[in-house]
From Swiss-Prot:
InterPro entries: IF-2B-related, IF-M1Pi, IF_2B-like_C, Initiation_fac_2B_a/b/d, M1Pi_N, NagB/RpiA_transferase-like. HAMAP family: Salvage_MtnA. Catalyzes the interconversion of methylthioribose-1-phosphate (MTR-1-P) into methylthioribulose-1-phosphate (MTRu-1-P). This is Methylthioribose-1-phosphate isomerase. Pathway: Amino-acid biosynthesis; L-methionine biosynthesis via salvage pathway; L-methionine from S-methyl-5-thio-alpha-D-ribose 1-phosphate: step 1/6. Its EC number is 5.3.1.23. Substrate binds at residues 48-50, 90, 195, 246-247. The active site is at 236 (proton donor). Pfam families: IF-2B (PF01008). Keywords: Amino-acid biosynthesis, Isomerase, Methionine biosynthesis. The record marks 156 as: Transition state stabilizer. Belongs to the eIF-2B alpha/beta/delta subunits family. MtnA subfamily. It catalyses: 5-(methylsulfanyl)-alpha-D-ribose 1-phosphate = 5-(methylsulfanyl)-D-ribulose 1-phosphate.
Length: 348
């Protein structure tokens, strides 16, 4: 896996992250010393990507568990409070909730203070390895949908630095590279924080994958002029009926895919599904600081005091999605029934 940059490292009971806000200018690794720093790292997007946030949150909980003192009951209460604080950092992505739910069960069921952090550590490491395998399997299924020479458009960053390895939407491009299959990627810059420009092009170029950067308002023209054959995106939350929350701008890509008659794919692990929500109407959409829109590199790009609407995500209705690609396979024409048939017992 030498082609991948590790965005989360857990060694010697310490969590270290690649500060993604400094890319592409600098590869800076930040050691996480305490919970407040970890929460700030999530909120300020130094660590980002739904799977990566969940893995990071798990390791932070482990790190805190090894530092607990007092009785078993006190340690349990303290760690459940830590878990709740981590969960509150990013309301839209569901992966973090799913990971913390698993770890919370271990906290509640622990019978000795000594075993508590050890069991949490084992589970967090297991989840990290599972995510790497899951991402690769998503890539395997996604690659089957593409042909040699395809030109595929994506938004934001659903790559290796947003997961343990490979990524979700970018996984097929890594596998195509490994197998010598030529695919071209067009990366939409992804305003206002430029994850497509700063992160996706950085990691794909680093891996030797053919990638071209475009601005967000070039998408329709690019689909037409460059004969884009498909669009693939990641996801932060998928409801029971297949409605998908992802980076703001995804919904309009789905509409353009429908207009041009090209497939629109969502690539995501089972941990991104929220089976407690029937539709996208139930998803809480995070709104972020206005300065992300009114400033660039600390300089004003809009007049002071102008009202700003800055949602971080939008919801793409399931009927605009050609297929959802998971580690279990491809869910074509996603809705409640097709998702249930593919995922089966995982819906319960």
């Amino acid at each position: 896996m030498s082609q991948f940059v590790q965005s989360i490292i857990y060694e010697n009971r310490t969590v270290t992250i690649l500060d993604q806000t400094r890319l592409p200018e600098e590869e800076h690794y930040e050691i996480i010393h305490d919970l407040a720093q970890a929460i700030d790292a999530i909120k300020q997007l130094r660590v980002r990507g739904a799977p990566a946030i969940s893995l990071f949150g798990g390791f932070v909980l482990v790190q805190e568990a090894f530092r607990t003192t007092g009785t078993l009951a006190e340690a349990k209460q303290e760690l459940l409070e830590v878990s709740a604080q981590l969960l509150a950092t990013r309301p839209t992505a569901v992966n973090l909730r799913n990971v913390l739910d698993e770890l919370n069960q271990l906290i509640v069921s622990a019978t000795t203070l000594k075993e508590l952090p050890v069991r949490l550590e084992q589970k967090a490491l297991e989840l990290y390895q599972t995510d790497a395998k899951t991402s690769r399997q998503i890539g395997v299924h996604a690659l089957e949908l593409f042909e040699s020479g395809d030109r595929v458009l994506t938004i934001c960053n659903a790559g290796s630095i947003a997961t343990a390895a490979y990524g979700t939407a970018l996984a097929p491009f890594y596998l195509a590279k490994e197998q010598g299959i030529p695919l071209s990627v067009y990366a939409s810059e992804t305003r206002p924080l430029l994850q497509g420009a700063r992160l996706t092009t950085w990691e794909l170029q680093r891996a030797g994958i053919d990638v071209t950067l475009i601005t967000d308002n070039m998408v329709a023209h690019t689909i037409k002029e460059k004969q884009i054959t498909a669009i693939i995106v990641g996801a932060d939350r998928i409801t029971r009926n297949g409605d998908t929350a992802n980076k703001i701008g995804t919904f309009q890509l789905a509409l353009l895919a429908r207009a041009f008659g090209i497939p629109f794919y969502v690539a995501a692990p089972l941990s991104t599904f929220d089976f407690t929500s029937l539709s996208g109407d139930e998803i809480e959409i995070e709104e972020r600081d206005a300065r992300e829109v009114t400033q660039l590199a600390g300089k004003a790009t809009a007049p002071a005091g102008v009202p700003v609407f800055n949602p971080a995500f939008d919801v793409t209705p399931h009927d605009l999605i050609t297929a959802i690609i998971t580690e279990l396979g491809v869910i074509e024409h996603p809705d409640v029934e097709t998702i249930k048939r593919t995922i089966g017992q995982h819906t319960h």
